[in-house]
Design a protein with these regions (language model features):
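N-terminal targeting leaders
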Residues: 2-251
């Protein structure tokens, strides 16, 4: 009789566990989907794209359309950095023609996206109107000569850019920067990863990126101290980054 009672209790316990697991998974999946939609990246860069997010036991599927290849990568990196996500199946499609790698249209997209990641430049007011044979022409407004010069520096360091003509005017700032703005960690991580990939000086780095409460930790390898210091400098200027812990080793 005692043995039978134990068996019944064990069966009941297993049944309760089986019932509770889907409920827990469902809540986690709902949280993943909600966090992705409310993230800085989705509300800022991807707000005009048609992206559907579905999470099943932490396996996330992204479907729909985006306007640029960079948006597809940003969506993947953001979702992959969310707590509870095990993997991302990125089936997003890019609308329209895909510019060939290192073409002028491709460089134009990369320069514009890279400038948007950095808070010390006026990415929203910077117009990348013309790219010809790798030479980028910048127009729009900067809030100071120093900001204009930094915009030139960042654009020159984008992989594939051969030169920059900066025709931006200098005007008094009318919009606030993102300094001190609280941006979710997944969005910070995604921006940092994309920024490091797009900059020529850091594109070859073997770097892992994690973010906790705005503090970014870099790990991996750098060729020398200069390369390591540059990575820290660039990451420090990304939207939402509060500080950087650079744990990269030098080869």
């Amino acid at each position: 009789m005692k043995v039978m009672c134990r068996v019944i209790l064990m069966v009941a316990a297993v049944a309760l566990l089986a019932i509770s697991m889907p409920v827990h998974a469902s809540k986690m999946d709902d949280r993943i989907e909600s966090s992705a939609r409310k993230s800085y990246v989705f509300e800022t860069y991807l707000k005009t794209d048609d992206i559907k997010i579905q999470s099943v036991n932490g396996v996330v599927s992204l479907t729909g359309t985006v306007s640029e290849e960079s948006h597809k990568s940003l969506a993947r990196e953001t979702v992959a950095s969310l707590p509870g996500v095990k993997s991302v199946d990125n089936r997003l499609e890019v609308k329209g023609d895909h510019p060939a790698e290192y073409s002028d249209a491709w460089l134009k997209m990369k320069v514009k996206t890279t400038l948007l990641f950095h808070r010390s430049v006026n990415g929203l007011k910077t117009e990348v109107n013309d790219v010809k044979d790798g030479i980028v022409t910048l127009q729009g407004e900067a809030t100071s000569k120093a900001q204009k010069d930094l915009t030139t520096e960042y654009a020159k360091d984008v992989e594939g850019v051969k030169g920059v003509k900066n025709e931006m005017t200098v005007a008094v700032a009318k919009t606030s920067s993102t300094v001190g703005q609280n941006i979710d960690d997944a969005s910070v991580t995604a921006q940092v990863k994309m920024m490091l990939l797009y900059h020529r000086s850091t594109s070859a780095l073997n770097t892992s990126v994690t973010t906790e409460k705005g503090v970014v930790t870099l790990a991996g390898k750098a060729k020398n101290a200069t390369e390591k210091d540059l990575a820290t400098k660039l990451v420090n200027d990304v939207n939402g980054v509060k500080s950087v812990k650079n744990l990269m080793t030098i080869e």
